[in-house]
Amino acid sequence: IYNHFLLPLSLSLIIFSCNNKEGYKLDMTAENIEVNWIGYKTNEKTAVSGSFSEFSSDRENQSFNSIDDLVDGLNFSISSLSSSSGDPIRDLNLKDYFFKYLTDNFEIEGTLGRPINDSIDVSFNILGQDKTVRFAYSTYLTTSKYSNKIIQIKGKLNLVNQFNGEAFNSIHKQCFDLHKGSDGISKTWEEVDVHIK
């Protein structure tokens, strides 16, 4: 028996800092970018996670005077066909009953706003309409293999109020029985947690 779930959108971006007065350089090669998601089902709020393997942006190999300048206006694109949850049947259901109704050509596109103190606006283009969501924003130093400064964005997305309700209804209907918990009630969570770093 396969457990299917609703997909939230979540990115994980690792930023490389030159750490000098000339500015910052963003190194967005495949090996130092993570794009992750977590979804929830059942009244017990069972979490299921996965990741996207294909991500691109318009800020690769460019230098900026600050992290804020680097982030402000960054356009990104994620191939939803690259979503993997470790369950091929679940991934196929997400493709045919969720992403098909959420995006054109299975591409999730968006733009990051300019950070303001501890928050940032992220605009998603959903079937030609821009949907803007505010998230918590922070940066921290790291000694990772790829970078010494990481951007972290946290928040919630509501896939009915903020995104295309048709996509939510489609995946909920397809996975109705699979989203039943121990109480026998089917639950697909509309609100999802997002963690970008």
What are these model-predicted stretches?
Residues I1-L6:
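Bacterial N-terminal signal peptides that target proteins for export
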Residues C18-K197:
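Low-complexity, acidic/polar, glycine-enriched regions of mature
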